Swiss-Prot record:
GO CC terms of this entry: extracellular region
Subcellular location, record wording: Secreted, Cell wall
Identification of the protein by name: Clumping factor A
Lineage: Bacteria, Bacillati, Bacillota, Bacilli, Bacillales
Segments of skewed composition (Basic and acidic residues): 887-896
Length: 933
């Protein structure tokens, strides 16, 4: 339904002459005097636009002129209801330029403008500004339609009009992905722009995002909103869709998936036509950046299509004029997509589905958020969940004590990551910290999506300081100086815009355990960037030259006329969205164990994204080896042992032993051991043993033993032995020991052994040992051995060890050994050790990713859409205008008349008197004429 102002006055030609004309005019003005002033200010009537109803050519068009004093247009939900005055809609029959702006509220009034099409304009006052980006240009094309108007992804269009202080006649409105399409019909000049059926369509296209619903602004990415055109999604051919990722995606290790598309464009496509790509709600296209952008599809150095993200998170591409001059256009597109932390909060399987039209791709992946880091009673994990490079800000979320352990005197510190050129600014002016208490650890989401309203804000109860440059410190001041529940720390900080480094942070938790042992645990956070790309090409199509006019032919519309939907799009865009797709993800890894052993681990991770992990280990080992051996052995040990032992022992031992033995043994063994041990031992032994052994062995043994032992032992021994042993054994053992040791041993052993062995052994041992051992020994031996041995051992050892150690050790060892050993051994061992240790390691992870998806786009678009709108209907003359239209166009530029307010009673009285006088004159003249006859 359209608003039209119809004012027609008919004059009857009678023989009564000038007097009757005068009387009729006076009577008409007398009756309409009180209503005319009102009509000049706000007179609209409603009329339905039926397809067969003829419209008058003198109908006026209502357009919009913006106020100049910081007028703003709202982007909030509004409905196209012309009865309640909520929405102001202004549309020209050719083009309407729409821009987004921010700041103040809007007050709208009406200004009549000459044209052929009529639209509805209502008043709108004090509309709040919710637009997040300024310099956002879009185009809307409205054609005349036959009893229907098609809307594709139409957003609210609001216009501001003012008859005063108006210096610009262009239409200012807000739109996102506006595409209004229609076809002309005979004798139809008014577009049905305010049909009530469009209300839901308008509302659905408006972004009303709550905090962290999606970590980007849809308004900000609609910088190149598509002009109106046809949705040709279902006309694309040779469509291919793919989801490229591993079976597992690690979002907190910069993990992402690639969405790949390919298609052919029909030759009938023209500038302004669009197609849609559906993106699943489990994915977003921004990662941790505050805004998301999609790459343009390029054909060499020309832009084939520009894309924006609509309010549902889907992507809409609009073709440029490249397709107007090309045939057989083909295009490919790749976009990085990230697991959405709000819609996927827990680790588990997720099915992803994306597509173009009826062609879709599905893939089920395991989303693994990985667990927090834990060291004894300390646990911590953090993530960088938002970056805004426009405002140079970031947000980091840290889980403190997510395991819910008891931590005494807990302290959290935040620093720049060591050995990096981090661009973070940490000080009181640039850093804001909020602390929340979590009553139940199960309430923590694994994706680190946090709704602060669900937790208790205890920021005022903790002590937050900045003791050193680029460092903050949070002390949890609880009544008993300990915490037993998780806490969430949210850090809002700033980035140095002049720094060339990346964002890299380290968070460290300190505290005592129940044994009053001070420990620390750290977690590092960094950011990786990824980018997408789009490409295409086509074959030049022939251009048909302009043909001469033929008699009776309709005059073609000039190409520079605003009624050509594709000729004056006026977009001069300069965008960087191809190389900067605006997606950031975080990679978090870190382990910090405080152990007094000396461990060094260097980890190297290679991921498809760019992850860089650096773990820091602090190890301190103190060993004192003083070996003083004096072996003057002149022994003639006539011991002829010929041992041929073939033992096959398969033992599975789990031993937790703490032994301090001082033994002097002379053994001649020929062992063939095949052991596979997986040891993960946790022993805390404090032993003080004093053993004095004196062994004198003179043996002549010939033993042939064949032992097959399959032992599974679990021993916990603390021995203080004073042994005097004389053994000559020949064993062949095949042991498979599985020991789990984590030793924290402080042993002080004093052993004094005196051994005098006179042995002459000729052993030919061929041992093939396949051992998997993890030994943690702490020995303090002071041995004084006087051995005279003449051994000829021929051992052939081949060791193939594959160890994967993850040790967690806290050892304080002091070893003082005085030993003198002379051994000539050739061992063939094939060991496969798998030890699980948590050590304090300084690991440097160097990952190489080519990703840059944080894009900054500069768009400067100039669109000119506002001409005389002289669209020539098929039944009109060539020039399309008559004298009345020209006069109306001229008069429309003049301001409205000052109607004022007259006294209605006086006016009616005057006109009544004049009408009476006229009537008397009329009757008198009739009588005179009658008398003459």
């Amino acid at each position: 339904m359209n608003m039209k102002k119809k004012e027609k006055h008919a004059i009857r030609k009678k023989s009564i002459g000038v007097a009757s004309v005068l009387v009729g005019t006076l009577i008409g003005f007398g009756l309409l005097s009180s209503k005319e002033a009102d009509a000049s200010e706000n007179s609209v009537t409603q009329s339905d636009s039926a397809s067969n109803e003829s419209k008058s050519n003198d109908s006026s068009s209502v357009s919009a002129a913006p106020k100049t004093d910081d007028t703003n247009v709202s982007d909030t939900k509004t409905s196209s209801n012309t009865n309640n005055g909520e929405t102001s809609v202004a549309q020209n029959p050719a083009q309407q330029e729409t821009t987004q702006s921010s700041s103040t509220n809007a007050t709208t009034e009406e200004t009549p403008v000459t044209g052929e099409a009529t639209t509805t304009t209502t008043n709108q006052a004090n509309t709040p500004a919710t637009t997040q980006s300024s310099n956002t240009n879009a185009e809307e094309l409205v054609n005349q339609t036959s009893n229907e108007t098609t809307f594709n992804d139409t957003n609210t269009v609001s216009s501001v009009n003012s008859p005063q202080n108006s210096t610009n006649a262009e239409n200012v409105s807000t739109t996102q992905d506006t595409s209004t399409e229609a076809t002309p019909s005979n004798n139809e000049s008014a577009p049905q722009s305010t049909d009530a059926s469009n209300k839901d369509v308008v509302n659905q296209a408006v972004n009303t995002s709550a905090p962290r619903m999606r970590a980007f602004s849809l308004a900000a990415v609609a910088a190149d909103a598509p002009a109106a055109g046809t949705d040709i999604t279902n006309q694309l051919t040779n469509v291919t869709v793919g989801i490229d990722s591993g079976t597992t995606v690690y979002p907190h290790q910069a993990g992402y998936v690639k969405l790949n598309y390919g298609f052919s464009v029909p030759n009938s496509a023209v500038k302004g036509d669009t197609f849609k790509i559906t993106v699943p709600k489990e994915l977003n296209l921004n990662g941790v950046t505050s805004t998301a952008k999609v790459p343009p599809i390029m054909a060499g150095d020309q832009v084939l299509a520009n894309g924006v993200i609509d309010s549902d998170g889907n992507v809409i591409y609009t073709f440029t004029d490249y397709v107007n001059t090309k045939d057989d256009v083909k295009a490919t597109l790749t976009m990085p997509a990230y697991i959405d932390p709000e819609n996927v909060k827990k680790t588990g399987n997720v099915t992803l589905a994306t597509g173009i039209g009826s062609t879709t791709a599905n893939k089920t992946v395991l989303v693994d958020y990985e667990k927090y880091g834990k060291f004894y009673n300390l646990s911590i994990k953090g993530t960088i969940d938002q970056i805004d490079k426009t405002n140079n800000t970031y947000r980091q979320t840290i889980y403190v004590n997510p395991s819910g352990d008891n931590v005494i005197a807990p302290v959290l510190t935040g620093n720049l990551k060591p050995n990096t050129d981090s661009n973070a600014l940490i000080d009181q002016q640039n850093t804001s910290i909020k602390v929340y208490k979590v009553d139940n650890a199960a309430d923590l989401s694994e994706s680190y999506f946090v709704n602060p309203e669900n937790f208790e804000d205890v920021t005022n109860s903790v002590n937050i300081t900045f003791p050193n440059p680029n460092q903050y410190k949070v002390e949890f001041n609880t009544p008993d100086d300990q915490i037993t529940t998780p806490y969430i720390v949210v850090v809002n900080g700033h980035i140095d815009p002049n720094s060339k480094g990346d964002l890299a942070l380290r968070s460290t938790l300190y505290g005592y355990n129940s044994n009053i042992i001070w420990r620390s645990m750290s977690w590092d956070n960094e950011v990786a960037f990824n980018n997408g790309s789009g490409s295409g090409d086509g074959i030049d199509k022939p251009v048909v030259p302009e043909q001469p006019d033929e008699p009776g032919e309709i005059e073609p519309i000039p190409e520079d006329s605003d009624s050509d939907p594709g000729s004056d799009s006026g977009s001069d865009s300069n965008s960087d969205s191809g190389s900067d797709s605006g997606s950031d993800s975080t990679s978090d890894s870190g382990s910090d164990s405080a152990s007094d052993s000396d461990s060094a681990s260097d980890s190297d991770s290679a991921s498809d994204s760019d992850s860089a992990s650096d773990s820091d280990s602090a190890s301190d080992s103190d060993s004192d080896n003083d070996s003083d051996s004096d072996s003057d052995s002149d022994s003639d040990s006539d011991s002829d042992s010929d041992s041929d032992s073939d033992s096959d022992s398969d033992s599975d031992s789990d031993s937790d032993s703490d032994s301090d033995s001082d033994s002097d043994s002379d053994s001649d063994s020929d062992s063939d051991s095949d052991s596979d041990s997986d040891s993960d031992s946790d022993s805390d032994s404090d032993s003080d043993s004093d053993s004095d052994s004196d062994s004198d062995s003179d043996s002549d043994s010939d033993s042939d033993s064949d032992s097959d032992s399959d032992s599974d032992s679990d021993s916990d021994s603390d021995s203080d032995s004073d042994s005097d042993s004389d053994s000559d054994s020949d064993s062949d053992s095949d042991s498979d020991s599985d020991s789990d040791s984590d030793s924290d041993s402080d042993s002080d052993s004093d052993s004094d052994s005196d051994s005098d062995s006179d042995s002459d052994s000729d052993s030919d041992s061929d041992s093939a040992s396949d051992s998997d051992s993890d030994s943690d020994s702490d020995s303090d031996s002071d041995s004084d051995s006087d051995s005279d041995s003449d051994s000829d051992s021929d051992s052939d050892s081949d060791s193939d060890s594959d160890s994967d150690s993850d040790s967690e050790s806290d050892s304080d060892s002091e070893s003082d050994s005085d030993s003198d050993s002379d051994s000539d051994s050739d061992s063939d061992s094939d060991s496969d050790s798998d030890s699980d240790s948590a050590s304090d390691s300084d690991s440097g992870s160097d990952s190489d990713s080519s990703s840059d998806s944080d894009s900054e786009s500069d768009s400067n678009s100039d669109s000119e859409s506002g001409s005389n709108n002289n669209v020539v209907p098929p039944n009109s003359p060539k020039n399309g205008t008559n004298a009345s239209n020209k006069n109306e166009a001229k008069d429309s530029k003049e301001p409205l008349p000052d109607t004022g307010s007259e006294d209605e009673a006086n006016t009616s009285l005057i006109w009544g008197l004049l009408a009476s006088i006229g009537s008397l004159l009329l009757f008198r003249r009739k009588k005179e004429n009658k008398d003459k006859k």
